[in-house]
Amino acid sequence: MNKKQKKVLARIIIAAVLMIILHFIPVKGIIRFLLYMVPYLVIGYDILKKAFKGIKNKQVFDENFLMAVATVGAIAVALYENGDYTEAIAVMLFYQIGELFQSYAVGKSRKNISELMDIRPDYANIEVDGKLTQVDPDEVAIGSVIVVQPGEKVPIDGVIVEGSSTLNTSALTGESAPRDAKCGDEIISGCINMSGVLKIKTTKEFGESTVSKILDLVENSSSKKSKSENFISKFAKYYTPAVCYSALALAILPPLFRILFMSAEPQWGSWIYRALTFLVISCPCALVISIPLSFFAGIGGASREGVLVKGSNYLETLSQTRYVVFDKTGTMTEGVFEVAGVYDNTLDREKVLEYAALAESSSSHPISRSLQKAYGKEIDRTRVTDIEEISGHGITAKVDGVSVAAGNYKLMKKLGLSYSETDKVGTIVHIAIDGSYEGYILISDKIKPTSAAAIKALKKAGIKGTIMLTGDSRTVADSVAAELGIDEVYSELLPGDKVAKVEELLARKGSKEKLAFVGDGINDAPVLSRADIGIAMGAMGSDAAIEAADIVLMDDDPLKIAKAIKISRKCLRIVYENTYFAIGIKLICLVLGAVGIANMWLAIFADVGVMVIAVLNAIRALFVHKL
């Protein structure tokens, strides 16, 4: 508990003790009134103060106003009729207990999320004259060498230049299994170094590092509100004035009706009491507090599992997802290409690889990198001229003055060359040198071990259709789709074709159904932003993914997609439970209050009791590990 909460708790205890003592003091009249005002002011002075401020600022209709009017009115009725002030003070007392509980619950949720996302480093170690000096991470320039000792957080993204260790990435990915890291490996901020001392050359400033982007994303998620939250805000705006005027009508109209049409006693005290009970019941705290708390807890629970959601609106959209579209490379497959062989070549294997690697040297595409890796020597780019990249086909260039073409069968057709056709599964890179076909290079990409299980999990979660888009050949695409159990596959697509295909798929679905696109974030930004919900996978260290997507999965496990959908559905289920429960109970109690069956004690349950139950239910959204 913080200082403010402890102060409220002390006031609750003092007021409760004073009420018990006063119960046994047999005094009447004005002295009884003055004595009971002591516990009332102890417990309610801040509510009265806020209500007065609201009236002064012309922001009248809120829960403080409702409680102030209800309790002051109840005291006035008690003073006029029987001198029993217990109910009025009990209303304020239990309201404060409910508020304290809500404050504690929200604080606890925030603390849980802060602990789960406790990845912000406090300092970075820099070696000066053989001694380690702690500096603020913001002060470390790009290219500096920092030292991370066992047990410390990696403060800034970089590359390991000395040492090896195991890293705990659980705060980022939700996975407890440690990862090995060695010299030459890229390392991201937010990981915890578990064993050896590491020297890291920074590649980013702290503000641009992974840890800063993640924290910024999580902290700003509450600004993007869901339809449910916006509905509750609008509902409260009109609901509170409506119940205030209804209570006023309940206090005045029935007595007037009795006087004018029944020639009976007006029973002002009885009807004012009913109106005050009506006001206490009508307080919208349960909805106003529990709905945002449900989303807040849901986003926190998701972040614990390595699923970062940029706002509750995206969580709501994800819960309605019925179609999932995947990019193949890096999403369903490892995205780590390796040369599996060189075929139908007349030149030496090494020579074919040399020409291919040099021709592709200006590209950062994974296939280009795999060719450079297979070549195994340092690339001398001065040997390469006249590079031309032909979208959807491949590359032409001159290597040592020799014309080289490397690409798919479309490129060979464009150049008017006959080529070898093959049924081998993998990416085929055909090579032509000085206008003569020189064979093809087979490049393979492994399917991720959990991809098939991920598709099954999605279908079990009620996903109607799984679709894969790829620029790869039809043979490769069909083979991967068949192995994984994917419903539809579209192959040989250019980057622009993927957007058009997603547009086509969006037009096919129902109006209330949502379509999610899952990519690795490297070149999928247009498609991620076009889908109803964009999900970037394996985003550790990928700025593009964190910027472009609505939801970011921090590791490469496709099983997390189904988990993210289950988390969103649990969160929305809790939101609906709280909405229906709170509105249902309040409507019943409002009717009972209006006809005189409900008293102040039932009103207290309808307000404070419902709020406590709704808040407890909302906190369940934090616990999603077993989904």
What would you call each of these model-derived segments?
Residues 339-465, 474, 486-502:
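P-type ATPase nucleotide-binding
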Residues 29-37, 60-68, 81-91, 231, ...:
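Membrane-water interface of transmembrane alpha-helices in multipass transporters/channels
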Residues 115-208, 313-356, 398:
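Conserved cytosolic catalytic loops of P-type ATPases
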Residues 63-70, 172, 273, 283-359, ...:
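Conserved catalytic phosphorylation-site environment of P-type ATPases
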Residues 2-123, 234, 241, 270:
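Transmembrane helix-loop-helix hairpins at the membrane interface
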Residues 401, 427, 433-577, 585:
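Conserved ATP-binding TGD loop and adjacent catalytic N/P-domain core of P-type ATPases
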Residues 65, 90-150, 181, 306-309, ...:
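Juxtamembrane coupling segments of multi-pass membrane pumps/enzymes
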Residues 1-14, 45-75, 215-249, 321, ...:
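Soluble-to-membrane junctions at the N-terminal ends of transmembrane alpha-helices
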